[in-house]
Regions:
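Mobile active-site "lid"/loop adjacent to the S-adenosyl-L-methionine
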Residues: 67-92
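SAM/dcSAM-binding transferase cores
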Residues: 142-187
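Conserved Class I SAM-dependent methyltransferase catalytic core
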Residues: 88-148
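Conserved SAM-binding strand-loop segment of SAM-dependent methyltransferases
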Residues: 39-51
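Conserved SAM-binding loop of SAM-dependent methyltransferases across substrates and taxa
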Residues: 2-15
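A short acidic, Gly/Pro-enriched loop at the edge of an enzyme's catalytic core
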Residues: 52-63
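Conserved SAM-binding loop
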Residues: 31-32
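Conserved SAM-binding motif I beta-strand of class I
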Residues: 17-22
Length: 187
């Protein structure tokens, strides 16, 4: 994508070295430009890579993925970015277990309907669910997304809910507090 998640991670962890990868050449160009314009540019790197075939001698403390949300054959404008054709959850989990440290974390943002399957899949690769955030678009609304964090090291499971809007076009205090260092806007 644009490198937004990497930029946010860099802002929160100023000493972290961040490698972003994407299979889409235009996305890599855009992320590269955004990284160059960032005050964190020395800690950010982007490469045109297919994660399935990603080779490295390094291990990572954190792998973050915001994968495509639509299954194959769904109607979508940007087919590659919106289909689980190039990188499916199995590929993601399997490759991540190869490159995270023993105490490392795999963090996946995904549609709520995929959460149960991804939890089962992670267990197949000896990953423990250590954190689950249930994301609601609006207070009282349906569960939309989950952030699932897995580790090779077993830890107590943390579960929390996160609400983006308390009413239409009115951000929740929770959202404003979390994003206050990334935006300037009023309540």
């Amino acid at each position: 994508g644009t490198g937004l998640i990497s930029l946010m991670l860099a802002q929160r962890n100023v000493s972290a070295k961040i490698l972003a990868i994407d299979i889409n050449e235009n996305a890599v160009k855009l992320a590269s430009e955004n990284f160059r314009n960032s005050i964190f540019n020395e800690n950010l790197k982007v490469e045109l890579k297919d994660f399935k075939n990603f080779e490295t001698n390094e291990n990572f403390d954190l792998v973050v993925c915001n994968p495509p949300f639509f299954e194959k054959n769904a109607s979508a404008k940007d087919v590659l970015a919106r289909q689980q054709v190039e990188l499916n959850f199995r590929n993601l989990v399997e490759k991540s277990t190869e490159i995270i440290t023993k105490k490392g974390i795999l963090s996946i943002i995904l549609p709520s309907e995929a959460a149960t399957d991804v939890k089962s899949l992670a267990a197949e690769f000896n990953l423990y669910l250590v954190r689950e955030i249930n994301i609601y678009g609006i207070e009282g609304g349906n569960l939309k997304r989950n952030i699932l964090e897995f580790s090779l090291a077993q830890k107590p499971l943390e579960i929390s809910d996160f609400v983006i809007e308390k009413s239409p076009r009115k951000y929740s205090d929770q959202y404003l507090n979390l994003t206050k260092n990334f935006h300037v806007f009023g309540k």
